[in-house]
Amino acid sequence: MSSSGVYTCNSCVLTFDSSDEQRAHMKSDWHRYNLKRRVAQLPPISFETFDSKVSAAAASTSKSAEKEKPVTKKELKRREKQALLEKKKKLLEIARANMLENMQKSQEGNTPDLSKLSLQENEENKEKEEPKKEEPEQLTEEEMAERVMQEKLRNRVDIPLEQCLFCEHNKHFKDVEENLEHMFRTHGFYIPEQKYLVDKIGLVKYMSEKIGLGNICIVCNYQGRTLTAVRQHMLAKRHCKIPYESEDERLEISEFYDFTSSYANFNSNTTPDNEDDWEDVGSDEAGSDDEDLPQEYLYNDGIELHLPTGIKVGHRSLQRYYKQDLKPEVILTEGQGTLVAAETRSFLPAFDKKGVQTQQRVWQTERFDKKRLDKRSAKFVNNQPHYRDQLLQ
């Protein structure tokens, strides 16, 4: 090796004519290997020796690669799964490509059809708009009422007398009485004042027309769109009854009743026994007789109804108070109160000595356990948490 060069490598004992050659040598594997040998205090080797060692190492690695371990079942399963996944990916890609091609073809074929459809729709819309312009914009109240009535008559549902008014499945019965019995037991449909009812069939027809024709609830006058909607409302709200509380509600169905028979007792009481003893009475005296009528026949407040017989009929809203059987208050004397207090002592539970002893034992064991725990916890000196302020570190 000549020593005339300016640039040298002490690890490989080489000289270079330029700095570029020196930099290229410093990046080579041969230089790195000689540096490691220098650290291990070994002499440097030549490039031929380094090349032979590299080729020998490559041959040994290839031999070791050939001598692999035997493939296990787990490894085989993993490889099979990987192969299946790759196949699935390929199939999905093929299917996606086919789908895109079909979509493109369908779009190309349907473009003229879409234009035709759009033209047809525009023509239909124009035809619909033309008759709308011809119709009158404003209608009077009478015309509107007539139109609504005609629509209701078209949508009318006739409910026969033998059919239930509230069942959605349209249950039929043999006669009206059986139908009314079913509605009373199943839905609570009760006809008030049946004693004075004259036209039962007319009342049922009126209720059926109110539900079937008007689609109106018989209690709250809720109006539904269809018969089914009204029936569902009445079943849900328990409005399957004839309202008979206010004066307007009674007047609504008054044409089906006749209460003239209820005044028979009053007329019989006022008629004289002997018709021969009639006397002419002036108008002033007749008016005074009317004023002397007992108040029981005329008095009727919002809570109780006073009948001519003297019976008082209560309102249904106060039914729970009428059902109460309250005993009258009895004021006891001092001696009677003392006797009652003495009698009630017998209802006290008897003194159980064994039960008291058992309770005392339980309390004793609880106190003993608590003392033992306190004693054990006091033995540990380092039982308090340590606090270290981080700012003072």
Curated annotation (Swiss-Prot):
Pfam family, one: zf-C2H2_2
Modified positions (Phosphothreonine) in chain numbering: 140
Domain of life: Eukaryota
Alphabetical keyword list: Cytoplasm, Metal-binding, Phosphoprotein, Repeat, Ribosome biogenesis, Zinc, Zinc-finger
Ranges of Acidic residues composition bias in the record: 273-293
C2H2-type zinc finger locations on the chain: 7-31, 162-187, 215-239
GO BP annotation list: budding cell bud growth; mitotic cell cycle; nucleocytoplasmic transport; ribosomal large subunit biogenesis
Region span, Disordered: 55-82, 102-145, 268-293
GO annotation, cellular component aspect: cytoplasm; preribosome, large subunit precursor
Polar residues bias locations: 102-113
One annotated GO molecular function: zinc ion binding
Extent of Basic and acidic residues compositional bias: 64-82, 123-136
Family assignment from sequence similarity: Belongs to the REI1 family.
Cited function: Pre-60S-associated factor involved in the cytoplasmic maturation of the 60S subunit. Involved in the dissociation and recycling of other late pre-60S factors like ARX1, TIF6 and ALB1 before newly synthesized large ribosomal subunits enter translation. Cooperates with the co-chaperone JJJ1 in the release of the nuclear-export factor ARX1. May act redundantly with REH1 to directly promote a stabilizing structural rearrangement in cytoplasmic 60S subunit maturation independent on ARX1 recycling.
Misc remark: Present with 830 molecules/cell in log phase SD medium.
PANTHER family for this protein: CYTOPLASMIC 60S SUBUNIT BIOGENESIS FACTOR REI1, ZINC FINGER PROTEIN 622
Protein name: Cytoplasmic 60S subunit biogenesis factor REI1
Source taxonomy: Eukaryota, Fungi, Dikarya, Ascomycota, Saccharomycotina
